[in-house]
Amino acid sequence: MANFNKVSVANDARTELHDKLQLTGAEVSVNNLPAGASVPFVHYHKKNEEIYFVTAGKGKAVIDGETVELKAGDWLRISPAGRRQFFAAADEGISYICIQVRENSLEEYTADDAGIEQ
């Protein structure tokens, strides 16, 4: 396993993968809010943008005072300065993955960063 790490994630309220996967360029968390619950604080970041993928359920994010409805299959990017808080719907929980990376750090991606072996 010199070139990869693998973990299994339980259905906990929040699991951070930085240490579990020995990540060096990102933080990834798996989040589950039950119906009617919310993240108990508003937050922002100094340097990192966040990308969210809703894997199940529904809810909303309030970003800089604006409500964004969320459902399974939605993707959402929030810049570092965006003040955000997440809420599950009253009648259904929400599960999502959050990927946190330094804003404007991506120099190459997809084919530009790949080496193809024949």
Regions flagged by a language model, labelled:
Residues 1-26, 34-35, 107-118:
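A short, N-terminal "cap"/entry segment at the start of jelly-roll beta-barrel domains
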